[in-house]
From Swiss-Prot:
The keyword Cell inner membrane does not apply. GO terms for molecular function: 5-oxoprolinase (ATP-hydrolyzing) activity; ATP binding. Pfam families: LamB_YcsF (PF03746). Catalyzes the cleavage of 5-oxoproline to form L-glutamate coupled to the hydrolysis of ATP to ADP and inorganic phosphate. Its EC number is 3.5.2.9. This is 5-oxoprolinase subunit A. It comes from Corynebacterium glutamicum (strain ATCC 13032 / DSM 20300 / JCM 1318 / BCRC 11384 / CCUG 27702 / LMG 3730 / NBRC 12168 / NCIMB 10025 / NRRL B-2784 / 534). PANTHER family: 5-OXOPROLINASE SUBUNIT A, UNCHARACTERIZED PROTEIN YBGL-RELATED. InterPro entries: Glyco_hydro/deAcase_b/a-brl, LamB/YcsF/PxpA-like. It catalyses: 5-oxo-L-proline + ATP + 2 H2O = L-glutamate + ADP + phosphate + H(+).
Length: 252
């Protein structure tokens, strides 16, 4: 049977403000990218989400971002190398402490939002994130955009990389994500997202936003937890994959 990792960005609530339906999503995914307090989340949300993931045997990842909670980490920041190294270490350390207190372990790091997109093309910021991860634990893997430059940059210094695709995002003809600033960048229809996820999982091409067929190689598929249809998307993806004998399972 074919297997594929299904992940979601979770733990992004803050105080009395609630984002998504994390517990229900955790019942369906195999990996949880949990916010570490910089782009979203807080100490209580972080700890509760880690415990909930561990209780469901869901793999735990550090979802690190720019220190920009007001912008939800989706604004580009020009940040010095040493500062980004330190902020990477700081965020991983926070979730590692929560994991240790829960009897769990952090297995990978997935950057968020603008940081994720920047390090896919910017070798300097990518180097800072890679350095921070390696200083904390070189056994942590990096989850990154499939086919982006950071994949080889991280592998060149010994980091394991998990190449990621997105069930709920549109792609360009060259296999890149369509900018969120453009209409149609985010997919909200469960049927469409499930069809795209199945293609990723089975090594088939997807249809770009401009109509071309695009083949994107990956071993993990993401559904954004802040997508209003997140739960419906995940439910449809899981049932569609199962109907085609694809099992949702950890990437490692």
């Amino acid at each position: 049977m074919t297997t594929i990792d299904l992940n979601s960005d979770l733990g992004e609530s803050y105080g009395s403000w609630v984002m998504g339906n994390d517990v229900a999503v955790l019942d369906l995914v195999s990996s949880a990218n949990i916010a570490c307090g910089f782009h979203a989340g807080d100490a209580t949300v972080l700890f509760k989400t880690v415990r909930a993931a561990h209780a469901r045997h869901v793999r735990i990842g550090a979802h690190i971002g720019y220190n920009d909670i007001a912008g939800f980490g989706r604004r580009n920041l020009d940040i010095a190398h040493d500062d980004l190294v330190a902020e990477t270490i700081y965020q991983i350390g926070a979730i590692q402490a929560a994991a240790k207190a829960s009897g769990a372990v952090v297995e990978y790091v997935k950057p968020h939002g603008a940081l994720y997109n920047t390090i896919a093309v910017d070798e300097a910021q990518a180097a800072a994130v890679i350095e921070g991860i390696k200083l904390v634990n070189p056994e942590l893997s990096l989850m990154a955009l499939a086919g982006s430059q950071i994949v080889e940059q991280a592998r060149a210094v010994g980091l394991q990389v998990e190449q990621e695709t997105f069930a709920d995002r549109a792609y360009t003809a060259d296999g890149q994500l369509v900018s969120r600033k453009l209409p149609g960048a985010v997919l909200h229809d469960p049927e469409t997202a499930a069809r795209q996820a199945l293609a990723f999982a089975t090594g088939q091409p997807i249809t770009a936003i401009t109509g071309e067929s695009v083949l994107v190689d990956a071993n993990s598929i993401c559904v954004h937890g802040d997508n209003p249809q997140a739960l419906a998307l995940v439910e449809k993806i899981v049932t569609t994959l199962a109907a085609h004998e694809v099992q949702v399972s950890h990437a490692r």
